[in-house]
A protein has these predicted regions:
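A broad, low-amplitude sensor of folded, mature protein cores
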Residues: 6-12, 86-91, 165-167, 192
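Flexible beta-edge/linker motif
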Residues: 17-115, 123, 130-143, 181
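Interface amphipathic segments
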Residues: 43-49, 64-68, 111-210
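Extracellular/lumenal and peripheral-membrane lipid-interaction modules
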Residues: 1-19
């Protein structure tokens, strides 16, 4: 299960609790206690402890065990503690992984500074991460709350490109819309455009680093 999970999601899974097979709402494995790790370098791994991890399976190919295919996994009611130094690892995962769908619901994200103090607590209603060769895009959707403001975040990049991405953040009450498009020439050279729409006023800024 652990090796297949890594193969399908590019995430390391350590199972520490019981595993139950459940049919509803769709066939899935319910893992009572586990941890997941993102990143190939042990010094830059991000690890999270997960209770009641649901790993959904392809119903057309449940047996034999050696041919089980996972379709997606789902996490609920989990606190994610992320340090400043771990941001680049997360970014690299979203940009470079070829994971099957990931769903996170009713959880919280804690951003921690270098002194182990909590900078931000963001309640998250849902996070969906999908990669698809069919429409040629990787997509990240987040719906949550930040500084008592409800927001929706949408990020996408071309599936076969590591250099271009787009992000849109929509805050509600007050209505603030931020869009950013980033184009990399290489790892150290990029250009982009950021636009801010607030009170029916739009400001657009272009930038580049060579």
């Amino acid at each position: 299960i652990e090796s297949k999970f890594y193969s399908d999601f590019d995430i390391k899974l350590n199972i520490n609790g019981d595993i139950k097979y459940q049919l509803l709402p769709k066939p899935h494995l319910l893992i009572s206690d586990s941890s997941i790790s993102i990143g190939e370098n042990n010094n830059k791994n991000i690890s999270f402890n997960i209770k009641n991890l649901k790993v959904f399976m392809n119903t057309n190919n449940l047996y034999p065990k050696s041919k089980i295919n996972f379709e997606k996994f789902e996490i609920q009611n989990t606190n994610f503690f992320i340090e400043n130094k771990e941001y680049s690892t997360l970014r690299n995962y979203f940009h470079n992984s070829e994971s099957k769908p990931i769903y996170i619901k009713k959880s919280k994200v804690f951003l921690i500074d270098d002194n182990d103090d909590t900078l931000i607590i963001s309640p998250i209603e849902k996070i969906n991460f999908t990669t698809s060769q069919q429409d040629n895009f990787k997509k990240l959707n987040i719906k949550g709350n930040l500084f008592d403001l409800n927001f929706k975040l949408f990020w996408k990049k071309k599936y076969n490109s590591k250099m271009n991405s787009q992000i849109e953040i929509d805050f509600q009450e007050p209505n603030i819309l931020i869009r950013n498009e980033l184009n990399y020439d290489n790892n150290s050279s990029f250009e982009g455009t950021t636009s801010l729409n607030f009170l029916n006023q739009n400001v657009e800024i272009g930038y580049q680093l060579k």
